[in-house]
């Protein structure tokens, strides 16, 4: 139903950024689980076709990692084959790809096991959902991906904005977001 509402408002020149897979990959959740190289890919292709049918530009985004480190301080892949399925669909359908899976690994590893919890909600107890700092770092990754993919949308981005390297994230200590009189900055809306 949400997608139908989105489609009803979509018009030529719009962009549809497509990123999902966190819950689809959980085989213990039968209500959301789908196989990566069959049903999941088919769903992605439906999103792409519906966007194109309306003159919009689809853009695929791989899922960001969960914050799960191995013993060497490297991020572990908890999404199985889903990121690769997205990459395959991007190639098969000739769709721009933003590899947030790869960029988030660089980001989390740069922060390390000690500082990376500062990018997540519930004071780092949540290893999936980001706080405002983490969401901002990932948003910068997406902006980088828009530029690297050569999307025409990149011309709408502020030209003097500094380039972002997820291996060199903004210092968490220096991050500030103006206070809101109605909402805490510990957890972003929609999370």
Language-model region placement:
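Mixed-charge, low-complexity intrinsically disordered regions
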Residues: 173, 181-182
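A short, charged, Gly/Pro-tolerant segment at domain boundaries
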Residues: 158-173
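Alpha-helical cap/lid subdomain in secreted, periplasmic
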Residues: 2-159, 178, 186-191
């Amino acid at each position: 139903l949400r997608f139908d509402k989105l489609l009803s408002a979509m018009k030529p020149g719009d962009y549809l950024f497509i990123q999902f897979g966190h819950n689809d990959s959980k085989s213990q959740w039968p209500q959301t689980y789908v196989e990566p190289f069959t049903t999941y890919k088919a769903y992605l292709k439906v999103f792409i076709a519906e966007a194109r049918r309306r003159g919009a530009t689809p853009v695929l985004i791989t899922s960001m990692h969960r914050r799960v480190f191995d013993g060497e301080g490297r991020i572990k892949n908890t999404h199985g084959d889903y990121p690769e399925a997205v990459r395959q669909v991007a190639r098969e359908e000739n769709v721009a790809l933003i590899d947030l899976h790869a960029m988030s690994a660089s980001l989390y590893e740069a922060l390390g096991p000690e500082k990376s919890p500062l990018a997540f909600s519930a004071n780092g107890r949540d290893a999936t959902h980001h706080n405002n700092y983490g969401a901002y770092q990932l948003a910068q990754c997406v902006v980088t991906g828009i530029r690297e993919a050569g999307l025409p949308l990149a011309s709408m981005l502020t030209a003097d904005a500094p380039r972002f390297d997820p291996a060199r994230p903004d210092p968490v200590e220096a991050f500030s977001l103006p206070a809101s009189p109605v909402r805490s900055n510990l957890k972003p809306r929609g999370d």
